Curated annotation (Swiss-Prot):
Its main location: cytoplasm. Residues 10-204 form the tr-type G domain. PROSITE patterns: G_TR_1 (PS00301), G_TR_2 (PS51722). Signal peptide: none annotated. Belongs to the TRAFAC class translation factor GTPase superfamily. Classic translation factor GTPase family. EF-Tu/EF-1A subfamily. This is Elongation factor Tu. GTP binds at residues 19-26, 81-85, 136-139. Residues 19-26 are annotated as: G1. Keywords: Cytoplasm, Elongation factor, GTP-binding, Hydrolase, Magnesium, Metal-binding, Nucleotide-binding, Protein biosynthesis. GO terms for molecular function: GTP binding; GTPase activity; guanosine tetraphosphate binding; translation elongation factor activity.
Amino acid sequence: MSKEKFQRTKPHVNVGTIGHVDHGKTTLTAAITTVLAKAYGGSARAFDQIDNAPEEKARGITINTSHVEYDTPTRHYAHVDCPGHADYVKNMITGAAQMDGAILVVAATDGPMPQTREHILLGRQVGVPYIIVFMNKCDMVDDEELLELVEMEVRELLSQYDFPGDDTPVIRGSALKALEGDEAWTAKIIELAEALDSYIPEPERAIDKPFLLPIEDVFSISGRGTVVTGRVERGIVKVGEEVEIVGIKDTTKTTCTGVEMFRKLLDEGRAGENVGVLLRGTKRDDVERGQVLAKPGSIKPHTQFESEVYILSKDEGGRHTPFFKGYRPQFYFRTTDVTGTIELPEGVEMVMPGDNIKMVVNLIAPIAMDDGLRFAIREGGRTVGAGVVAKVIA
């Protein structure tokens, strides 16, 4: 029994494999589950179980993703692997599978390839905080100097996109040989697991972050004041604390005078809970859906940001035609739509359905945002794209 209890208290970390097609991402995923299951318990997953990834929908977008789990002595990992390049792009932009760290797989036989670069860039844009490199197929390269060269190229590429290339762990291995049980190579999988444990810090839990609640509804209760409802996204709000109302209009301060859940009064509302928050001295018309309630000073409203977006294909129910500069859709953040205009990168005239692209967005009203916030692009209530705030500008 004691073992079960211990399992549940292990920190939970989300990771995934990224890298160029056919460099061995799925084979590595299978090798990790197989080797770690033998070493530390858990269940092995075969290559074809992982490769045959089920379809799932995230924000109306179809993505093929495989989810596997494995344990090290100190942590529990949830790991995502995607069969196709397009699935990676969609996954990273929608945040369907948020990664605390990524394992970049680079075949020693090829070195860095176009998708290697694209996945590193995407990782930077969507806020993947840590990358570890697994140089795969090293059993097929006899020349030590060639291995050195590939490693150097990968490190330079990481540094180019503001990852610490010189300090990144690089493990040289062979996923296939490890999967076949060759001990020299299974040791490299254990080494990779140890690098995950030591290099990726334990993610901060939502409850430890500053309080934020996206406002879904506003009511006025006679004799008591104004109540806003929503699901607490992060942090804790306690009765008696000062909070800010941020977004759409000028930021205002107010005090939380009550928290209720299912008509019961509570002392506080915590991350993940659906609550009503009573606000002192706030008028019904001062607050609206689309604003957020937040710890004072923790989040600011912005109208201009750089984003990475994926435009749905026609088959996904997206647009049938491209759009051009001057396109004015709605941008759906958390609970509301705000109209905005777009600026396309230099030299890009139009964007086709199915493309992913970097664009600068200018909203007509400010929204509470940080880098990493996800949004949908909509036309008349229909989702035509998904995006992530890469960098707030103004």
